[in-house]
A protein has these predicted regions:
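Structured soluble/peripheral alpha/beta segments that form catalytic or ligand/cofactor-binding pockets
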Residues: 1-290
Length: 290
């Protein structure tokens, strides 16, 4: 069960232990999307800050810096132009980004209780623990001296651990959230050395469900990639035992970008989804070993 204490900095013994908070936003009406991360690397004495922002379907900012230093408190964390604060644990946060081309300030308000990644086999394979909130976001985005209001949905994720890249070839997370309050989170890991899609471990769950309700029994995720390797289209079928029909989602990317880090390819796409006919938005992240 996620409690207020989990909002504090997490610790671990491994040399590659990382403690990361990410906040993203989707404003479909104004065609504004973005995500920012701060990653504590306490056992290495380093901290990494990253941000990706899109406007009008185009990449407006992509930045990443890793430096010597420390972030000791998620209540007020700052690194290389990215600032995150916790106003009320598990309820309200803020994000500010100062980049070469954009400036961003937003507040994020939890719409539903936190959702914890609970899949023992998946957690063992990846080596991480994670919880997340689907949020309402409200703020301002400045590009080239012009300021635009930003309102929509988003997600805040807190994850920590020493990721098992000796056991994992590819890691994917995605979510879809509608203005009507429905939201779904998905995570998937493909084991190292596996022969394809069928060996991937997958987990999916609705936000806001009772903590005793299990995740979906069957998670079918299909993705079409564009020529640059970015997720372009995706389909989900989620089924529980006894259900006559699956819960279906279909989505198409509205923007995306790729980067590389430490022998891994990172793809970030923002999707417009149809959640059983209801419009929804969300971020699709993928990290794969080269």
């Amino acid at each position: 069960m996620i409690e207020r204490k989990h909002e504090g900095p997490r610790s671990g013994t491994g040399a590659r232990f990382a403690d990361t908070v990410a906040i993203d936003f989707c404003d479909g009406e104004r065609d504004l999307y973005g995500i920012a991360w701060i990653t504590r690397l306490p056992n290495a004495g380093r901290v990494r800050a990253s941000a990706v922002v899109f406007a009008g379907g185009e990449l407006a900012e992509m930045t990443e810096h890793e430096d010597d230093g420390a972030v000791d408190d998620w209540g007020a964390a700052q690194a290389s132009g990215v600032r995150m604060t916790t106003a009320v644990p598990l309820e309200r946060w803020s994000l500010a980004v100062t980049g070469s081309s954009v400036s961003l300030e937003l507040d994020a308000y939890a719409l539903l209780p936190p959702l914890q990644l609970e899949h023992p086999e998946l957690s063992h394979m990846t080596g991480i623990e994670q919880y997340e909130h689907v949020c309402r976001v409200d703020g301002t985005l400045g590009i080239a001296g012009s300021s635009t209001p930003l309102r929509g949905t988003g997600r805040r994720v807190h994850c920590w651990g020493e990721f098992g890249w000796d056991r994992v070839d590819r890691w994917r997370t995605l979510y879809a959230a509608s203005d009507g309050g429905r939201a779904i989170s998905v995570a998937a890991a493909r084991p190292a050395g596996s022969d394809g899609h069928d060996s991937e471990l997958r987990w999916a769950r609705l936000f806001g469900t009772d903590t005793g309700e299990p995740a979906f029994d069957q998670v079918r995720l299909s993705t079409v990639f564009d020529a640059g390797g970015l997720p372009a289209k995706a389909g989900l079928e989620l089924l529980n035992e006894g259900d006559e029909f699956p819960l279906r989602l279909g989505g198409e990317a509205v923007c995306g970008a790729r980067s590389e880090r430490d022998g891994h390819e990172i793809a970030i796409s923002f999707f417009r989804w149809s959640l059983e006919g209801e419009p929804a938005y969300g971020c699709y992240e993928m990290i794969a070993r080269r």
